[in-house]
């Protein structure tokens, strides 16, 4: 039954249907429908059909210009290259049975450049950057994760390990720079000792970038971390690299050899480190990482040349490589507040991830990074490099994101 409030009448549904059939159209206002059961059928929007447009070849065939013949299926194998050389394997940390703190991380060991040639034995490793003093210049998309722990490097390291699953930690002793706080090597060593007690993952030990102070800081920190197989970062031709080599040999550590996008410079530095007595199996190269849009092509060129030369048998460059992927956050497109570029919370990790993936394709083994989102993503991508093609199932439905309006 249908009741019209305005007219105060009750109308039978059949009567209403007859009226509609007679006039063809009727508008109803202010009505109430009373029914034991009411079924309303609302037609759904028709599905979107992807138009199938003929290819150029099919159009030419229709016009009689060409004739399409069945092409037999051919077997195809990727062009697998066999290399006479190999990339050395470098270990960070030691098991407790050997006097270490337990956690062990290995990088390198490859015998090919591409995954389809041969999966690499060890996945790429990401090490979280932390600093010995708060860094006010860090962009907000990074500060939001660490604002509560930036005053305490030990708590910062714990958060990276416990909440974000860090495999390694890089500590930058920024405060030792004479132009900042000029903290002594002894103070840096005390902090290093506290960090070793706070977390059990291997460390990359960095200085402030001051060529006079860094060798002294790295030597002091290497002593308190004796036997833990850390990575001393870094030795270069502009400072007393022999002091760093001596500390690495005396206290059982590895050395990061830093050069500036020049394979010849990297090779020369490695040669000098070896001549100073350092085992080549203790060297990790850092050819310098330029951010996406800020010279990344120069880094690509240097890293691919170093990796290929190492695989071809040059034993002065067949070491694993490291990337300061954090450099990507210095790109203004990553951190600058510009609504036209989209949210910074997305742009910054995307810039760091893209820079990292690019370096990964060049053969980089160790990534120094800051943003937890970037770290998680790059670690997941890196796992695929240890698998054979076909073992990882990919979603090939390119139209899955298209929905009806």
Curated annotation (Swiss-Prot):
GO biological process: one-carbon metabolic process
Disulfide bonds: none
Origin superkingdom: Archaea
Gene3D superfamilies: Dihydropteroate synthase-like (3.20.20.20)
InterPro entries: Ac-CoA_synth_d_su_TIM-brl, ACDS_complex_subunit, CO_DH/Ac-CoA_synth_dsu, Dihydropteroate_synth-like_sf
SUPFAM superfamilies: Dihydropteroate synthetase-like
Annotated HAMAP family: CdhD (MF_01135)
Quaternary state and interactors: Heterodimer of delta and gamma chains. The ACDS complex is made up of alpha, epsilon, beta, gamma and delta chains with a probable stoichiometry of (alpha(2)epsilon(2))(4)-beta(8)-(gamma(1)delta(1))(8).
Primary role: Part of a complex that catalyzes the reversible cleavage of acetyl-CoA, allowing autotrophic growth from CO(2). Probably maintains the overall quaternary structure of the ACDS complex.
Protein family (similarity comment): Belongs to the CdhD family.
Protein name as annotated: Acetyl-CoA decarbonylase/synthase complex subunit delta
Encoding gene (name): cdhD
């Amino acid at each position: 039954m249908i009741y019209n409030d305005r007219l105060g009448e009750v109308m039978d549904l059949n009567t209403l249907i007859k009226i509609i059939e007679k006039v063809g159209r009727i508008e109803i206002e202010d009505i109430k429908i009373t029914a034991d059961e009411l079924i309303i059928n609302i037609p759904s929007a028709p599905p979107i059909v992807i138009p199938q447009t003929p290819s150029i070849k099919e159009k030419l065939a229709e016009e009689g210009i060409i004739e399409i013949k069945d092409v037999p299926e051919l077997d195809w194998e990727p062009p697998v290259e066999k290399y006479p050389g190999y990339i050395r394997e470098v270990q960070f940390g030691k098991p407790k049975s050997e006097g270490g703190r337990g956690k062990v991380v290995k990088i390198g060991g490859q015998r090919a450049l591409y995954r389809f040639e041969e999966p690499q034995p060890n996945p790429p490793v990401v090490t979280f950057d932390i600093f010995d003093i708060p860094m006010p210049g860090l962009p907000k998309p990074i500060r939001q994760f660490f604002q509560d722990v930036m005053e305490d490097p030990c708590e910062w390291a714990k958060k990276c390990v416990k909440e974000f699953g860090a495999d390694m930690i890089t500590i930058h002793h920024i405060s030792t720079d004479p132009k900042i706080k000029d903290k002594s090597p002894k103070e840096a060593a005390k902090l290093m000792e506290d960090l070793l007690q706070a977390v059990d993952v291997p460390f990359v030990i960095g200085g402030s970038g001051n060529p006079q102070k860094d060798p002294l800081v790295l030597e002091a920190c290497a002593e308190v971390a004796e036997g833990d197989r850390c990575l001393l970062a870094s030795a270069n031709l502009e400072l007393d690299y022999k002091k760093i080599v001596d500390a690495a040999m005396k206290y059982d550590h590895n050395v990061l050899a830093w050069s500036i996008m020049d394979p010849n410079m990297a090779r020369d530095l490695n040669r000098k480190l070896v001549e100073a007595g350092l085992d080549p199996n203790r060297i990790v190269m850092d050819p310098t990482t330029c951010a996406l849009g800020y010279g990344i092509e120069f880094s690509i060129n240097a890293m691919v040349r170093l990796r290929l030369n190492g695989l071809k048998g040059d034993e002065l460059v067949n070491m694993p490589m490291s990337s300061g992927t954090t450099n990507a956050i210095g790109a203004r497109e990553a951190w600058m507040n510009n609504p036209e570029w989209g949210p910074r919370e997305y742009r910054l990790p995307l810039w760091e991830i893209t820079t990292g993936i690019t370096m990964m394709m060049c053969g980089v083994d160790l990534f120094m990074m800051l943003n937890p989102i970037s770290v998680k993503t790059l670690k997941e991508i890196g796992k695929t490099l240890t698998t054979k093609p076909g073992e990882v199932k990919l979603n090939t439905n390119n139209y899955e994101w298209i929905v009806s309006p």
